[in-house]
């Protein structure tokens, strides 16, 4: 694995600023795909920006506007949360089924 610098921003705005300032950064959340790729030398970012502590990227919520009703699934929402969410099961049951079938339970608890 190549050397890299690790950053853990405290807000989404900080993460965006870091990304714009760094040479060849990559965002990391669960790390289930990126870290093995780095170990195999298939990816070599100069910096990793860890998004896992940014609560504004988590969760599932219903959005209502004048034309339609939509769901927002945050990028840091774990697969198991998607699989078990009542809104997902009601409006997009296939998405819940797919999320429940990803990997094993450890992957679903960690993967985003």
Segments (PLM) and residue ranges:
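C-terminal structural segment of proteins
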Residues: 1-112
């Amino acid at each position: 694995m190549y050397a890299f610098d690790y950053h853990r921003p405290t807000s989404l705005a900080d993460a965006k600023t870091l990304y714009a300032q760094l040479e060849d950064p990559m965002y990391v959340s669960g790390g289930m795909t990126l870290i093995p790729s780095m170990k195999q030398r298939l990816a070599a970012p100069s910096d990793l920006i860890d998004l896992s502590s940014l609560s504004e990227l988590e969760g599932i919520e219903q959005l209502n506007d004048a034309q339609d009703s939509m769901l927002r699934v945050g990028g840091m929402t774990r697969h198991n949360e998607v699989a078990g969410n009542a809104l997902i099961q009601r409006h997009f049951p296939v998405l819940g089924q797919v999320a429940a079938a990803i990997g094993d339970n450890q992957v679903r608890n960690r993967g985003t």
